[in-house]
């Protein structure tokens, strides 16, 4: 039986990764079908267990990923790592601490923000000011995607005009990875772009996902003009 997970995320985010790969290939003039096959091969190697590999084969690569589906967290991480290896090469960075140093994982999050602002979360973006979106809609999106418990640990504090600090407590969550934080940086950056913010900068100055972290809290410093 394919492995299941008690901790899942909304399938639209995973669907967005596939659409990001398609868009990336189009922008770079790559053969999408061949690239997807290479990513699939790499993902199956990275799956870690036969059960997870079977899940990827049957539910992710062979089935239809619906926006309303719930998909285990680990699927996203495996796909992001496989995509980075294929598109950027073995050893390419999987994470970043700043929007000023974008990685492929950052760009995947950024792409999803722009896409979802025009699709599944259009009402949560429409007519919002950046600070209004960060304090309300951003939390609502995470609640929708990751559940009430995760979203209840969010703290969004205004630190000045065009300056917000976001604290996310990952305690009790499935083992987190800096890749997750990088997609969050990208999502925040893309959302601010969509909302018309000028010169947005997202810095992840405290990360609870790195090995040896004393706590599970992640802090994102967000500024714009």
Per-range role (PLM):
Residues 51-183:
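Amphipathic interaction/junction segments at domain boundaries or subunit interfaces
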Residues 3, 7-11, 19, 143-185, ...:
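Short terminal or interdomain "cap/linker" segment that borders an active site or interface and mediates
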Residues 1-75, 85:
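Terminal low-complexity, intrinsically disordered regions
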